[in-house]
Curated annotation (Swiss-Prot):
It is found in: Cell membrane; Recycling endosome; Synaptic cell membrane; Cytoplasmic vesicle. InterPro entries: 2pore_dom_K_chnl, 2pore_dom_K_chnl_TASK, 2pore_dom_K_chnl_TWIK, 2pore_dom_K_chnl_TWIK1, K_chnl_dom. This is Potassium channel subfamily K member 1. Homodimer; disulfide-linked. Heterodimer with KCNK2; disulfide-linked. In astrocytes, forms mostly heterodimeric potassium channels with KCNK2, with only a minor proportion of functional channels containing homodimeric KCNK1. Interacts with KCNK3 and KCNK9, forming functional heterodimeric channels. Interacts with GNG4. Identified in a complex with PSD and ARF6; interacts only with PSD that is bound to ARF6. Interacts with UBE2I. It catalyses: K(+)(in) = K(+)(out); NH4(+)(in) = NH4(+)(out); Na(+)(in) = Na(+)(out); Rb(+)(in) = Rb(+)(out). The gene is KCNK1. It comes from Bos taurus. It is a multi-pass membrane protein.
Length: 336
């Protein structure tokens, strides 16, 4: 009997706090996913980093042996300066000195990566004025970009998602949920084809050192706004039509980001995903909210009445102990 009561109480407790339990499992799952990614990346990339370090040490040792007139501190000072310049997008290589990083098209590309929070990091402001302007420009521009993207996605979603689903539901009598699922899958396939596979094939042709996998990797890293910066198009030596190419890439990134947001919004509107998301939300208890509001109002009213009573008490304390008589009464007393 006691066990059944304890079991039923535990079940009621779990059901009552189901949203909190689901949220706790969500946080735990996210942390485990982060740890899983760190373990995989470390196990895969660390051996390649070690090989690269060993290769660089051998090259450095061989270079010093062949050039005995050059000391190791001098070489390290030179290499440090070269690496520092490379971090700012400036290279000392003879085949990489023809492209400017801050002409208009490159600056336009940089501004688009800043506002979209992609931020490849291949080009950064050099001057203090440029860094200060970048801060101010981002503080204003990023919320402006979010507002712009929200407005565009809302309008595009109406014409691309809601109206087609409603048309097939009303005109042909199909189930709205089934039509929404099929439409979301088809829209995802079209978006991946138009903004991932086809651009990856184009980049693999236009960029000499990129294969299809590297081009697809760039498309995904860019449109997901990760922006690692290890692959940046239009930075090759003697790139043909470089200005036009940079403008085209800027338009591609903006349109691709809008397309990605439309697809995400389409999937988020699916009934099944809405039910799944509600598992992790705090449930709104209207009666409990009303009780809190009433208690807050009562507390506010009682505090106001207490303040009014305090004011009246102060006024009474300031009054004299013997109240002055009215003038009429005083005159009558003198007549008598």
């Amino acid at each position: 009997m006691l066990q059944s009561l304890a079991g039923s109480s535990c079940v009621r407790l779990v059901e009552r706090h189901r949203s909190a339990w689901c949220f706790g499992f969500l946080v735990l799952g996210y942390l485990l996913y982060l740890v899983f990614g760190a373990v995989v990346f470390s196990s895969v990339e660390l051996p390649y980093e070690d090989l690269l370090r060993q290769e660089l040490r051998k090259l450095k040792r061989r270079f010093l042996e062949e050039h005995e007139c050059l000391s190791e501190p001098q070489l390290e000072q030179f290499l440090g300066r070269v690496l520092e310049a490379s971090n700012y997008g400036v290279s000392v290589l003879s085949n990489a000195s023809g492209n400017w990083n801050w002409d208009f098209t490159s600056a336009l590309f940089f501004a688009s990566t800043v506002l979209s929070t992609t931020g490849y990091g291949h080009t950064v402001p050099l001057s203090d004025g440029g860094k200060a302007f970048c801060i101010i420009y981002s503080v204003i521009g990023i919320p402006f970009t979010l507002l712009f993207l929200t407005a565009v996605v809302q309008r595009v979603t109406i014409h691309v998602t809601r109206r087609p689903v409603l048309y097939f539901h009303v005109r042909w009598g199909f189930s709205k949920q089934a039509v929404a699922i099929v439409h979301a899958v088809l829209l995802g396939v079209v978006t991946v084809s138009c903004f991932f596979f086809i651009p990856a094939a184009v980049f693999s042709v236009l960029e000499d050192d990129w294969n299809f996998l590297e081009s697809f990797y760039f498309c995904f890293i860019s449109l997901s706004t990760i922006g690692l910066g290890d692959y940046v198009p239009g930075e090759g030596y003697n790139q043909k039509f470089r200005e036009l190419y940079k403008i085209g890439i800027t338009c591609y990134l903006l349109l691709g980001l809008i397309a990605m947001l439309v697809v995400l919004e389409t999937f988020c509107e699916l009934h099944e995903l809405k039910k799944f998301r509600k598992m992790f939300y705090v449930k709104k208890d209207k009666e409990e909210d009303q009780m809190h509001i009433i208690e807050h109002d009562q507390l506010s009213f009682s505090s106001i009445t207490d303040q009014a009573a305090g004011v009246q008490e102060d006024q009474k304390q300031n009054e004299p102990f013997v109240s002055p008589q009215p003038p009429a009464l005083a005159d009558g007393a003198s007549d008598h």
